[in-house]
Amino acid sequence: MSYVSSKFLSGLHIKPSHKRIAVVGSGGKTGLIWRLTEELVQAGKKVAVTTTTHMAMEKERPFAPDGEGAEALILRHGYVLAASIDRQKEKLCALPYEKLRELSGICDVLLVEADGARKKPFKIPMEWEPVIPEFTDIVIAVSGLDSLGQTIKEAAYRPFETALFLGKKETDVISPEDMIRAVSDKNGLLKGVGDREYRVYLNKMDTVKEREILDRIRRELSDMDIPVFFGSLREKKKNTALIMLAAGSSRRFGENKLLYKIEGIPMYERTLSCLLKVQE
């Protein structure tokens, strides 16, 4: 059985048997987690989202502070964001391990953000990273393709350590070979995976103009038996459509109200100007 109608679940070969999913890396972890949450809820699954490191607050999400009331929120919304709060950093942080275990027992799928990168698109983990719960079924590594062609100093979280790992200088650019190594090396994003299933999601494929680069990455990872999925989590801008009704005989008004001036500007022109500002 599989989620055949769901783009990201299908692309990452996520199956209903994958109940505890950890997401590591950089360049789109949180966005991927929320996209997977959306697809899982649409598939009728009860979902809990949490972190073992730090995660941005999401005020519009159903939130269970310290995991309290999580089950009721899942029943009401289909999913819940459950975490403790680091008030100094104004971020969400890890639940106590007992609470994390408890959370995993009240949902069909637990999605865990198990790494941090401060919004940088490229990352190599340090000794203490990532923080993957031991009961995890599958690990998804995320990296941003927009880092290709950028210098390590520009694109990497902890550029000095990243350059050391890659055998480069901080001023050197990140290449497709660097990306392949980052997601396939046991000291890279494969770190801590062990015998769990492993997937790679490479985000922002729209920033790569040469299709051959994507083909090369896919081919080399395939040779290592590492499934990779390319995509883009950027939200498309929604255009606002506006209709202005500008007709009528103006009998009660006594004159053509469309041409009636307010502060020297015809009413229709003033209204149109306001609508165009709203559309911006």
Sequence positions of predicted segments:
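Loop/turn-to-beta-strand initiation segments
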Residues: H77-V80, G105-L110, I138
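General beta-strand structural signal in soluble alpha/beta enzymes
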Residues: V23, A48-T51, L81-S84, L110-A114, ...
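N-terminal phosphate/diphosphate-binding loop that engages ATP/GTP or pyrophosphate donors
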Residues: T37-E90
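Structural alpha-beta junctions
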Residues: Q42-V47, G105-V109, R218-G231
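Conserved catalytic-core segment of NTP-binding enzymes
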Residues: S2, E90-E98, I106, D115-D223, ...
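N-terminal glycine-rich phosphate-binding loop and ensuing alpha1 helix
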Residues: N239-E280
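Walker A (P-loop) phosphate-binding motif
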Residues: V4-V41, T240-I243
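Structural motif
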Residues: G25, T52, S84-D86, N203-D206, ...
